[in-house]
């Protein structure tokens, strides 16, 4: 009897502990249930990952521990290496002018706006940047997105339906392909830069309401330039629209950096221009569409990534305003990129390497073919102080692995020569060149 009385006194003291243990039991049971349900999926994923590794196409992520520049440091080493694989074409990613402009925007407009554009996410800075970009490209109007991927994803669905046709180059960027898949238009694909095939499709689709020819201005994996004059001529002949992505040309390609339309002599003949601020324009984030005022107004009403994504941060907008202002005040920035490009291409070709792409474009793919060879080649280049990456399937077609080098205005001629010297040493060591 006394024992029962003592137990009644002690029991309330253990009640909180019991509740804690019971709660932990429930959480563990829940976790075990999730693990069991996901085990089959994880097993299948691990098999897929093993297959990728066995094929030599698994993509490791090297960790950079410095600012993006011509010289960087990589995790695991304090030694600086030369970076020849960034989209930092104009060398502005670490520009003191852009950093200062971003700081000023932080002070004046804050860190973020916590809103989409049509609620309370549009500032005077956003409107100023849109005006600058439209002026830079010689277009009527511009609409900003969080990224060019969003700009491409939100364009076609808003404008075209089943009465229309979207006619796309077969090697267009993944973001373009995804954007086209989202729309209800009839979809056609022409062989890469094949104008006869494009004309065949234009002839077949003359009964449709609108036809839109869609192409990258410069193709990112090969560095080749779309034949925009021929495309525009066909568009005029068959009453079609022309849409281009200028991500790998705006700001640095063409005499004054106005991109592929300037390089090909078709300024004023392009209906829609999409591009990014994440490459030559400082390398941060942001994308856009330039078009007529009517098209841009419709995109503001119907483009889903624009309507349902947070507005671009003020610091990014402030830096971008500075970038476009600099480009419109001076045309000298692209000149250094071109000089570095010609030096690299001339020396590499003379050494016996096979390079893809246009002679004037800073994307200089060194073609190797085998995926495992491309990965090994890149690793040996890093040992020699040159940071490059091997590209293989599914980023590029099977059997067309390469090291995609990219020249920058941040590189000195001496650094470009060091890069070529390393390529020659590794190329001879691995039997790529004699």
Predicted regions and their residues:
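Active-site phosphate-binding strand-loop segment of PLP-dependent enzymes
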Residues: 88, 188, 192-244
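Conserved PLP-binding catalytic core of the aspartate aminotransferase-like
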Residues: 92, 335-345, 349-385, 395, ...
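Conserved PLP-anchoring active-site segment centered on the Schiff-base-forming lysine
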Residues: 155-174
